[in-house]
Amino acid sequence: MPLLASGQDVAVSTNLMDYVSLGTINAEASVGVGRHISLNASARVNPWTYHKGDPGKQMQNRHQTYAAGIRYWPWHIYSGWWFSTAAQYQEYNRGGIISPKTEEGDAYGLSLGGGYSLMIHEHVNLDFGLSLWGGQKTYITYACPSCGRITDKGAKWFFMPNDIIVSITYIF
């Protein structure tokens, strides 16, 4: 099982569903290290604040997220079903979307996921999947996105959805 990449062993992708999440920019790179295993690294960034300065309407899902993980492909890398796990870190500030409550902090943990890669061309896949992640977070909760009134802070464990995946993948 060589650790050097060759043709059809390197891929880049972007998750279209992240763009729906208030414009999150994202990319993932992957390298196959065997017939059934690929190593992945991803980054997501959302720097946007909407209706800034309007306390009643301001909302944001600002974050920077980094993950490194592994995928197991029962049939062959970049084809068919897959299962994944990753270590993930996120610095975040989100609020004003469903309620005025806003939380910011740092989170780190492990994610577990699965999905299916549909080959639509020799070099292009359409990937579908879901993942969950859990870990530890340190946070501060504010009454609203712009008021600065702290209502809670601390550290706690969490378990929550991580990704809804509809990705376009290019395989070199």
Where are these regions (language model features)?
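Gram-negative (and chloroplast) outer-membrane scaffold detector with strong preference
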Residues: 31-128, 167-170
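Cleavable N-terminal export/targeting peptides
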Residues: 1-9, 172
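Short leucine-rich amphipathic alpha-helices used at interfaces
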Residues: 8-9, 15-16, 102-103, 139-140
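Residues that define the transmembrane beta-barrel architecture of outer-membrane proteins
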Residues: 8, 21-25, 60-66, 104-110, ...
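Solvent-exposed loop/turn segments connecting transmembrane beta-strands
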Residues: 13-31, 46
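Predominantly the C-terminal beta-signal and adjacent terminal strand-loop region
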Residues: 121-172
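Extracytoplasmic loops and strand-loop junctions of Gram-negative outer membrane beta-barrel proteins
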Residues: 9-12, 51-53, 95-98, 147-153
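Sterically constrained small-residue positions within well-ordered secondary structures
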Residues: 3-5, 30, 74-76, 157
